[in-house]
Amino acid sequence: MRRNTDLTIALAGNPNAGKTTVFNRLTGSRQHTGNWPGKTIERKSGRYKHAGMLIEVVDLPGTYSLAAYSEEEIVARDFLLEGQPDVVVVVVDASNLERNLYLVVQILELQLPVLVALNMTDMAETIGFEIDTDNLSDGLGGVPVIRMVAARGRGIEELKEAILLYTKQQSKERTPDPIV
């Protein structure tokens, strides 16, 4: 899925986890966000520049799983399997962590590079949830976890930096040593 960009990232997550808000913050777009499942059915893409790199962002439909029973699940699953994103940023609603982590685990099982954008941390704290991101990262096999409140723009720059750092690390891990 290369269209003259340096990186392609996929935004995945449950409905209403804030994927489109993250997409808008990253790309400067103004995609309409809605507070109901099924708002985004097709994938949308946009671009942004960061640290001299042109990065394509693909906003996948919100889905609870990759079981491929609904149109949203099919679109999301097919892109993850065939679109070859450099990294999948799974946007997770911190106030509903358990339900959201099911999709994270399914995407990890596809053996794709994953970052977790732990969104709506302000709402989670309001209802008394304290999430240890280091512990969560360890529990997910070392997947980077970035705290954010996308609606307020908090954590967006950290997410951009994490995407670059993580994709550079993944690239080094995949590059074989030269044969001498």
Question: Regions from the language model: what does each represent?
Answer:
Residues 1-65, 83:
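Conserved G1/Walker A P-loop phosphate-binding module
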Residues 22-23, 41, 59, 76, ...:
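Residue-level signature of catalytic and energy-coupling elements of molecular machines
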Residues 29, 38, 62-63, 94-98, ...:
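Conserved nucleotide-binding/hydrolysis micro-motifs of P-loop NTPases
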Residues 37, 41, 56, 68, ...:
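Helical mechanochemical/support elements of P-loop NTPase systems and associated helical scaffolds
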Residues 49-52, 75-145:
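Conserved C-terminal guanine-recognition region of P-loop GTPase G domains, centered on the G4
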Residues 179-180:
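Flexible inter-domain linker/hinge segments
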